[in-house]
Swiss-Prot record:
Cellular localisation: Cell membrane; Secreted
Listed cofactors: Cu cation
Signal peptide per UniProt: 1-18
Name of the protein described by the UniProt record: Probable GPI-anchored cupredoxin ARB_05732-1
Length: 186
């Protein structure tokens, strides 16, 4: 029989390696993502916190700023205090924008895992300036949202139609859940 202590240690070490990267949306009422260049590894969580109501988080291709691509991530319109989390599954660049009104064309853009050369956040912002109104994806997708109020399980309360099936736990909550599951198997 495999030593359960070894399995537990390996499982918890993998979870502990993942991190949560915090991004503030509309900090101080501005049309900003702070930071606007986000470095995240595979299995990290990028966690967006809304500082002011009336924004969203959308993604699209570099060469079509302010427009969604197929299977874009999309938070839906969020209010002050709402949160949206995205689990990073690869290190390809993810170009972000706010699709509300002309927020994108006014510079409300960001990138997860910017390339080391070539397409820059400055070039994306400049191209977005001529894009007019932003376009939202057709549905909430590729993330989980919550009110920021923890449930008894420690995760944000689900508020989007698909949030319950894709809800991501914070590192601490995941460690507690995994530890409890392994102890239950012993």
């Amino acid at each position: 029989m495999v030593n359960m202590n070894i399995l537990t240690t390996v499982a918890l070490a993998g979870l502990a390696a993942a991190k949560t990267v915090e991004v503030v949306v509309a900090e101080n009422g501005g049309l900003t993502f702070t930071p606007n260049q986000i470095k995240a590894d595979v299995n990290d969580i990028v966690h967006f916190k809304l500082a002011k109501s009336g924004h969203d988080i959308s993604s699209g291709p570099f060469d079509m700023p302010c427009k969604p691509s197929d299977n874009s991530l999309y938070s839906g319109k969020l209010n002050e205090g709402d949160e949206f989390s995205v689990n990073i599954t690869n290190t390809d660049p993810i170009w972000l924008y706010c699709s509300v009104s002309k927020h994108c064309s006014k510079g409300m853009v960001a990138v997860i895992n910017p390339p080391s050369s070539g397409n820059t956040i400055e070039a994306y912002k400049q191209a977005a300036a001529g894009a007019g109104n932003g376009q939202a994806p057709s549905r909430v997708n590729n993330g989980s949202s919550g009110s920021g109020t923890p449930t008894s399980g420690g995760a944000p309360a689900a508020t989007s139609p698909n949030a319950a099936s894709s809800l991501t736990f914070s590192g601490a909550a995941a460690l507690v859940a995994m530890g409890g599951a392994w102890i239950g198997l012993l």
